[in-house]
Amino acid sequence: MDRKEIFERIEQVLAEQLGIPAEQITEEADLREDLGMDSLDLVELVSALEDEVGMRVEQSQLEGIETVGHVMELTLDLVARLATASAADKPEAAS
């Protein structure tokens, strides 16, 4: 997943979850102030992203998550860690 795909997925989940137009969702949008999310909404968003990426988010990783951009950075980090773990699990190609 690249940055654009991650944003589109977050945008889709938030629009469905919150019942708001996708156009209202930007990287700069504050989850609470601009989008009206509460802590339960954040848990549901993270759960959907965990399912999408296939990795779990630690509670400590949620600290400081205030904007859609922060959610994107967290998701990009998870995708990168998953790719690194997958590469480490693959046996080296025979020479």
From Swiss-Prot:
Major location (coarse): cytoplasm
PROSITE patterns per record: CARRIER (PS50075), PHOSPHOPANTETHEINE (PS00012)
Record's subcellular location: Cytoplasm
One annotated Gene Ontology cellular component of this protein: cytosol
Pathway: Lipid metabolism; fatty acid biosynthesis
Pfam families: PP-binding
Gene3D superfamilies recorded: ACP-like
Record PTM O-(pantetheine 4'-phosphoryl)serine, positions in chain: S39
Phosphoprotein found in the keyword field: yes
PTM comment text: 4'-phosphopantetheine is transferred from CoA to a specific serine of apo-ACP by AcpS. This modification is essential for activity because fatty acids are bound in thioester linkage to the sulfhydryl of the prosthetic group.
PANTHER family in the record: ACYL CARRIER PROTEIN, CARRIER DOMAIN-CONTAINING PROTEIN
Function, as annotated: Carrier of the growing fatty acid chain in fatty acid biosynthesis.
Recorded family membership: Belongs to the acyl carrier protein (ACP) family.
Protein name in the entry: Acyl carrier protein
